[in-house]
Design a protein with these regions (language model features):
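N-terminal amphipathic/basic-hydrophobic helices that include classical n-h-c signal peptides
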Residues: 1-25
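N-terminal topogenic module of multi-pass integral membrane proteins
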Residues: 26-124, 128
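Juxtamembrane boundary at the C-terminal end of a transmembrane helix
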Residues: 232-242
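Membrane-proximal helix-loop-helix units in multi-pass membrane proteins
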Residues: 128-194
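Hydrophobic cores of alpha-helical transmembrane segments in multi-pass inner/ER membrane proteins
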Residues: 93-103, 149-161, 202-207
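Membrane-helix boundary connector in multi-pass membrane proteins
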Residues: 185-197, 204-220
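Membrane-water interface at the C-terminal end of transmembrane alpha helices
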Residues: 155-170, 208-222, 232-234
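Central hydrophobic cores of alpha-helical transmembrane segments
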Residues: 114-123, 172-181, 218-230
Length: 242
């Protein structure tokens, strides 16, 4: 055989190996969760635009609430005074919950990545554009955290989409997601346990509902395992994005 023939044969072998790996990976992921009902391209575009505008609206509202507290309508001011909505929106838990909902209710893992990324692009951009051009300041260090989180959000959304599957791996993934959410919603130690706010308690409960399993027993087991995982995570990574 000539050198060219050997090279071509090597290339074909490499392509075959890559194709084999791709097929195995697709089968592995489909065993966790498969696309249930394909949707049209028009519907995909509409959904992505909708979550983009949702992000823009929530980012703008969050910064408005933070910057214009003294100018809020009396009812909204009273609600904010009781629930401390401004600080609640400044923490991670609510945004992680919204992203989780967008992810698992998307049509596929790829769509979850696109939709969640669009949401965070809209939310983070509107928040910091408002902060810079209307409020007149730009908190660079805090913004860098959100920019980084936005950059990795497609990967996280891709993984989270599979949490609604029926396999054992999906069950473990759901428990791990809840563990992260638990550490964002609660502060605890050897002799104390507190919720950051009543709104964070609601966030965690909604997370449980969204990730619930087919039976009450399985859901309760998932919640219990998530708390154990949360404590273990707290030992390894004591810093929380809260």
């Amino acid at each position: 055989l000539s050198v060219v023939e050997l090279f071509i044969g090597f290339e074909y072998n490499e392509i075959d190996k890559l194709e084999f790996v791709r097929v195995i990976m697709i089968k592995f992921l489909n065993d966790i969760r498969n696309v249930e009902k394909p949707i049209s391209n028009n519907r995909k575009i509409i959904n992505t635009i909708a979550v983009l505008f949702l992000g823009i609206a929530l980012g703008t509202f969050s910064k408005f609430l933070d910057f214009r507290q003294a100018e809020l309508p009396s009812v909204l001011m009273a609600i904010n005074g009781v629930l401390d909505i401004g600080n609640f929106l400044g923490r991670f838990a609510i945004w992680v919950l919204i992203a989780l909902c967008i992810s698992i209710y998307s049509n596929s893992a790829i769509r979850a990545s696109i939709n969640v990324f669009a949401f965070f692009i809209g939310m983070v951009a509107s928040y910091y554009l408002y902060s810079n051009y209307i409020a007149g300041f730009f908190p660079r260090s805090y913004a860098m955290i959100w920019f980084g989180f936005t950059a990795v959000s497609p990967l996280l959304a891709f993984v989270c989409w599979y949490a609604r599957g029926k396999s054992k791996l999906a069950f473990i993934l759901s428990a791990l997601i809840l563990a992260v959410l638990f550490n964002m919603c609660f502060v605890y130690g050897c002799w104390y346990f507190n919720a950051k706010s009543v709104l964070e308690v609601i966030v965690f409960i909604i997370g449980l509902i969204v990730l619930r399993r087919d039976t009450l027993r399985s859901s309760a087991l998932m919640g219990t395992i998530s708390i154990v995982l949360a404590v273990l995570l707290d030992m390894v990574i004591p810093f929380h994005f809260g």
